[in-house]
Amino acid sequence: MTLETPVRVLIVDDSAVVRQMLTEILSRDAGIEVVGSAADPLLAREKIKRLNPDVITLDVEMPRMDGLVFLENLMRLRPTPVVMISSLTERGADTTLQALSLGAVDFVSKPKIDVARGLEGYAEEIVSKVKMAAKAKVSALHRPSAPKVTLDMQSAPMPGSALRFRTTDRLVAIGASAGGTEALRVVLEHMPADAPAVVMTQHLPASFSTAFAERLNRHSAMSVREATDGEAILPGHAYLPPGGQHLRIIRDGARWRCRIDDGPPVNRHKPAVDVLFRSVAANAGANAVGAILTGMGDDGARGLLEMLQAGAPTLVQDEASSVVWGMPGAAYKLGAAQEVVPLDRVAERLLALSAQAR
């Protein structure tokens, strides 16, 4: 596919209304061509072979074959960028997170009632995510995992007890978007139980945050949770903003606390990475480390620059391992990143930089 060629899209959804609405929404954009639609995965399988789409939109719950089973088979046999169409329910959130772990690039929320009007309200998001998916590197989601990071007392750069992170004076701040649900899992999976405290912002719908925190917690030696307003930030813990709210940090004497912020969207996002990073720059300065992982757009780039200017070491995920090198690329181009690191080394570098932080 070249830049001049429209993105070829196949729509897979058991609802005729949804198929029609998605066709209308996507066809309005000159850069997209809807080449076909299918009511279930079995029909879709034949159309994929015949139509060779660049992107597939896929409903999660469908007859004849579960959407997750279809997605898993697709990624194994014919990796293709997929944007999931998912319901804004707790069950839908968990299923969508499973889909992202299987290789879906991103998802769009589908309302349970008044679907036609609801999808129209997401038209801009649907178009932008389909176009982004066409450029995404599906293979980046299936890179082999590195072995879990352990602190080697002999090879680490600092002596003695400085390697143990049982203090409150180190903080890691991470931001991510498209592809980030899996990237964050990989990073946290390789952080030890006594790692410095981690504060994170991942672009997600409000109803997804609890399921996402629980999913990360199952994969990490750290304790991963949704932050509550005013709670102390502790080593060995990782904090996400609760649904649809910004996460900031504040200084309280010798420690930091979480501040939940219900202010307006920033960079069209709520939660926004820039909100978190700017608060970290102001309240933690050189005692923090900042990282931007895979994601679309430029949220977090300016905040990461503020962290760097405040004395914090900074890094971004490299393009080769990113599903979308939008946010990391924007930070790099802005001069906000001191290091560009493959995903399987991000945890290792965060630990090393935390040990060196002033």
From Swiss-Prot:
Subcellular location: Cytoplasm
SUPFAM superfamilies named in the record: CheY-like, Methylesterase CheB, C-terminal domain
Residue ranges constituting the CheB-type methylesterase domain according to the UniProt record: 157-352
A GO term from the CC aspect: cytoplasm
Post-translational note: Phosphorylated by CheA. Phosphorylation of the N-terminal regulatory domain activates the methylesterase activity.
Keyword terms of this UniProt record: Chemotaxis, Cytoplasm, Hydrolase, Phosphoprotein
Name the UniProt record assigns to this protein: Protein-glutamate methylesterase/protein-glutamine glutaminase 2
Organism of origin: Xanthomonas oryzae pv. oryzae (strain KACC10331 / KXO85)
Gene that this polypeptide is encoded by: cheB2
